[in-house]
A protein has these predicted regions:
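Conserved beta-propeller blade signature
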Residues: 22, 88-91, 160-164
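Surface-exposed loop and turn segments in beta-propeller and other repeat-based domains
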Residues: 1-6, 44-72, 108-138
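Loop-centered beta-sheet repeat module
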Residues: 72-116
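Beta-propeller blade signature
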Residues: 1, 33-46, 97-105, 174-178
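Signature of short aromatic-glycine-proline-rich micro-motifs recurring in repeat-based ectodomains
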Residues: 6-13, 65-82, 129-153
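Short, solvent-exposed loop/turn segments at conserved positions within beta-propeller repeat blades
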Residues: 29-33, 74, 94-95, 138-140, ...
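Short loop/turn segments immediately following the C-termini of beta-strands
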Residues: 26-28, 52, 94, 166-168
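Loop/turn-rich, solvent-exposed surfaces of beta-rich toroidal or solenoidal domains
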Residues: 141-178
Length: 178
């Protein structure tokens, strides 16, 4: 199973609540990159694919295209993982300028919500997953390093998300977006 994945260990791994390693990975023979999340078990070294973003966003994936000169389709460009609780993740997609919360990552992954541009996701079939913007602030664009932080001063169920905002929205695999 290990040889099935190309593992990019730069900043794209975290430890789960059992100290297993969750890693952003690319399937070795796939034509896509950085669109899978795998778990490496700490005791056995066994590798399990937890999340395949093509399974979660198939309609969006079908609208993307390989940029000229590219070797693989980096259609989401996931650049950070942050564990929310024992079974949820916050991921950052630079290619879509979207923050995505995934639930049930160990059994039946689903998208809980997304934070991104209404313009980017309108009529995509996924726009109902977007949280509503309730204040006047700049939306993130090409963000990196999204980090989940609990704070006991916040009401139950609320938390902070910190991120580095590149403030540059580029989507090379979705050329119709400008």
């Amino acid at each position: 199973m290990f040889l099935k994945f190309m593992i990019q260990v730069i900043i794209n791994y975290i430890f789960d609540s059992n100290n297993n390693i969750l890693v952003l990975a690319s399937e070795k023979e796939a034509k896509t990159s950085e669109d899978k999340i795998i778990m490496i078990e700490k005791d056995s070294g066994n590798i399990t694919e937890l999340v395949d973003l093509i399974d979660l966003l198939p309609d969006y994936y079908s609208t993307t295209s390989l940029p000229d000169g590219a070797e693989d389709l980096d259609w989401m460009h996931i650049n950070s993982l942050s564990l929310v609780d024992k079974t949820s993740l916050i991921i950052s997609s630079r290619e879509t300028s979207t923050i995505i919360k995934l639930d049930n990552i160990y059994s039946n992954p689903t998208i809980d919500y997304m934070i991104g541009s209404d313009n980017f996701w309108q009529e995509s079939g996924y726009d109902s997953l977007l949280l509503n913007k309730t204040s006047d602030f700049s939306m993130q664009a090409g963000q990196h390093c999204v980090t989940y932080v609990e704070d006991n001063s916040l009401p139950q169920g609320q938390y902070y998300l910190y991120l580095y905002n590149n403030n540059l929205a580029v989507s090379t695999t979705h050329p119709d977006y400008d």
